[in-house]
Amino acid sequence: MSIYFSGLMAPLDKNNVDTDQIIPKQFLTSTSREGFDAALFYDWRYLENDEPNPDFILNRPCYQGAQILLTRDNFGCGSSREHAPWALKQYGFEVILAESFADIFFNNCGNNQMLAIALPGDTLEQLFVLSEQHDDIHIDIDLENQTLTSTKFAPISFDIRKDVKERLLSGLDFIGVTETLNPQIDAFEQQLAAERPWQ
């Protein structure tokens, strides 16, 4: 088995988590991709006095350092903001497990080297039940063979688009993928110039 990633899973038992809940709009003041981790889930993580909310799941000591987020349906819905995956990744999340993702958010995850895995609702429900019984669920992710494994559950298979999988395995974003095609692009331009010298 080829392990792409291993990490601790933290459960966020909420449907329809939109990008404004992931990172509220008042924190969208920079395009540097840095410093957004403190604002992640701000309205849930903090009380009115900016003290950590002890009732919020990610503030529990057992989930400090979690790198896999388990959540529900339609994660990342709402307005398009790449700051949302930036905040998640800077906080430490590398993988998100959900029943479905908003399309733009899903693509932004891939562009930022985050693995977003859509799982059937019954599979997610089993993982949430397990998370109520155990707060130390570590998952090994074999991206090549598209499986999740753990000492707490039987192997789980998942689907992923081929282009997303290849980009994650290669570590390339869209620009990097385009640069790998430079020889073909150069050859096409030379051929076009020869066939249409008037252009």
Swiss-Prot record:
Pathway: Amino-acid biosynthesis; L-leucine biosynthesis; L-leucine from 3-methyl-2-oxobutanoate: step 2/4
GO CC term, one of those recorded: 3-isopropylmalate dehydratase complex
Species, as recorded: Pseudoalteromonas translucida (strain TAC 125)
Keywords: Amino-acid biosynthesis, Branched-chain amino acid biosynthesis, Leucine biosynthesis, Lyase
Single GO MF descriptor: 3-isopropylmalate dehydratase activity
EC number(s) given by UniProt: 4.2.1.33
Complex and partners: Heterodimer of LeuC and LeuD.
PANTHER family, A to Z: 3-ISOPROPYLMALATE DEHYDRATASE SMALL SUBUNIT, 3-ISOPROPYLMALATE DEHYDRATASE SMALL SUBUNIT 2-RELATED-RELATED
Top EC class, one word: lyase
Similarity annotation: Belongs to the LeuD family. LeuD type 1 subfamily.
Protein name in the entry: 3-isopropylmalate dehydratase small subunit
